Amino acid sequence: MNDLTGFQRDLLLIISGLDEPKGLDVNEEIEKYYGTEIQHGRLYPNLDTLVEKGFVTKGQHDLRTNMYMLTNHGKDEIKAHLSWTWSYIPDELKAGLTDSTLGTQTQ
C-alpha cells in the first residue's frame, strides 16, 4: 500500500467515478461525502500530491480550470485498497450488501 491518507484515497475514488472531473467537481463530491466545507487549501495540495505520486494526471479543461484523470497506477491503488478492505469485512456484513450498496450482488 502506498502512503496515502484516507482523504487522498477518497479523492481517488471520486476521480475514478467521474468523467474527467474538474477540481470544483471533485470538491463538490468530497464535501457531500464529508458533510462539511473543504477548503481549497486542503483540496488542491492533496490533488497535487496524487499527481506527483502518479495516481492521477492533471490536464487543462480551459485556461482557468484543471481536470483530473485516474492513471493505471491509481486504478491499481484503488483495487489493492478495496481488496484489502474487503478482506476485513465479516461474512455476515458481506451477505447483506446489495447492488444499491456495493454495485454488485453478493451471495
Descriptions of predicted regions:
Residues 79-107:
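Amphipathic alpha-helical dimerization/coiled-coil segments
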Residues 51-62, 69:
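Beta-hairpin "wing" of winged helix-turn-helix
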Residues 63-82:
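Basic, amphipathic "hinge/linker" alpha-helix immediately C-terminal to the N-terminal HTH DNA-binding motif
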Residues 2-39:
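N-terminal helix-turn-helix DNA-binding core of bacterial DNA-binding proteins
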